[in-house]
Regions:
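Gly/Ser-rich "nucleophile elbow"/oxyanion-hole loop immediately N-terminal to the catalytic nucleophile
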Residues: 151-166, 186
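Hydrolase active-site cap/lid region
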Residues: 181-236
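Short beta-strand element of the alpha/beta-hydrolase
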Residues: 88-97
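Short amphipathic alpha-helix adjacent to the substrate-entry channel of hydrolases
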Residues: 106-125
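A glycine/proline-hinged amphipathic helix-loop "lid/cap" segment
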Residues: 1-82, 313-336
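Alpha/beta-hydrolase active-site loop
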Residues: 134-154
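Short beta-strand/loop motif that positions the catalytic acidic residue
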Residues: 259-261
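Catalytic histidine-centered segment of alpha/beta-hydrolase-like enzymes
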Residues: 293-302
Length: 336
């Protein structure tokens, strides 16, 4: 039976890129510098690319911070809830970026508040534990505890614990899809949708774009290697399915996905490769490449966030999982 045209396009992209990808694995032989601190890494970027905390006074949102028990230490959750008209809200857990070693709830404020307001959802932004102080599996276990807290408190927030989505940027995209896998495997939480913005998915760094050809203004291969060394100090962890989604052979049963990649991002190939793997596993998947965007900028890009909002409105409206075989949508969007 011939492949559907949309599927063939996706597979062609993956095959072409794999031929020319450089091998960055030698970077794992480098030790972390003794003075290694997250603020040294390229995610700080240019001032123009920094995500500043949004003014939430006029967004019509009730925003509050909550402390819960995490895997290795207490963590903070930031709750964004739209003004209620009596409607029961869906739930979205959001995970900030920062390469597993930096980032904060404040960094995620623009994205989380936009999703809450425009989707009309109860959004919980998760302040998960950061490496190197708290390496894997602290972050995904924190994510799971945040999901458990959301389920336990949904009724009090007039939210529906049966309509949960997850989303994240960069390392947060990794945590979002890994949380979906953990929830599937443990069986006590059902996640209906996942939206991944420029996700950081491949600790092997064998699917990363050529740094000499993709002019990334905000992250580089050395920074990625340092982050993975800090987050996954044991080499065997770089194959764990809850740390390396692209290495997983058990993608069936994951929720429908939206994956947004940025043209000027070293990670766009692995993001699109993951989309192909999800499709092959029967997971309904939409892919959008933003051709004039960079890695950091995608987290608060209006076009990307509009796609996320539309995706969650569609996927969290129903109370049942979407049937297999949805059409893959591959788009390229100019942000200029």
């Amino acid at each position: 039976m011939p492949l559907r045209q949309e599927w063939a396009v996706s597979i062609a992209i993956v095959r072409c890129d794999r031929i020319v990808l450089p091998d960055y694995r030698h970077l794992f032989q480098m030790s972390l510098p003794p003075e290694f601190v997250p603020s040294q890494l390229g995610w700080d970027g240019a001032d123009a690319l920094k995500i500043t905390m949004a003014s939430t006074l006029d967004l019509g949102l009730c925003i509050e911070d909550v402390r819960i028990a995490g895997h290795a230490q207490p963590i903070t959750l930031r709750s964004y809830r739209p003004a209620s008209d009596g409607t029961v809200l869906p739930v979205v857990l959001y995970f900030h970026g920062g390469g597993f070693v930096r980032g904060s709830l404040d960094d995620a404020d623009v994205t989380a508040s936009t999703i809450a307001r425009d989707t009309a959802a109860w959004v919980i932004s998760v302040g998960y534990s950061l490496a190197p102080a708290f390496p894997f599996p602290a972050a995904p276990e924190d994510a799971y505890r945040a999901a458990q807290w959301a389920v336990a408190n949904a009724r009090a927030q007039r939210a529906d614990a049966n309509r949960i989505g997850v989303a994240g940027h960069d390392a947060g995209g990794n945590l979002a899809t890994c949380l979906a896998a953990i929830a599937r495997d443990r069986g006590d939480i059902v996640i209906l949708a996942q939206a991944l913005l420029a996700p950081l998915l491949d600790p092997s760094m064998t699917r990363m774009a050529d740094e000499n050809k993709v002019r990334s203004p905000d992250i580089g291969v050395t920074e990625c290697a340092q982050c993975y060394r800090a987050y996954l100090p044991n080499a065997s962890q770089r194959l764990h399915p809850y740390a390396a989604p692209l290495e997983s052979r058990r993608l069936a049963g994951l929720p429908p996905a939206l994956i947004a990649s940025a043209q000027h991002d070293l990670l766009h190939i692995e993001a699109e490769k993951y989309a192909g793997e999800l499709i092959a596993a029967g997971v309904p998947t939409e892919v959008t490449r933003h051709v004039n965007a960079s890695h950091n900028a995608l987290a608060a890009d209006p076009a990307a966030l509009a796609d996320v909002v539309a995706f969650f409105k569609k996927r969290l409206r129903a109370r049942t999982l979407a049937p297999l075989g949805d059409t893959l949508k591959i788009q390229t969007i100019s942000t200029t």
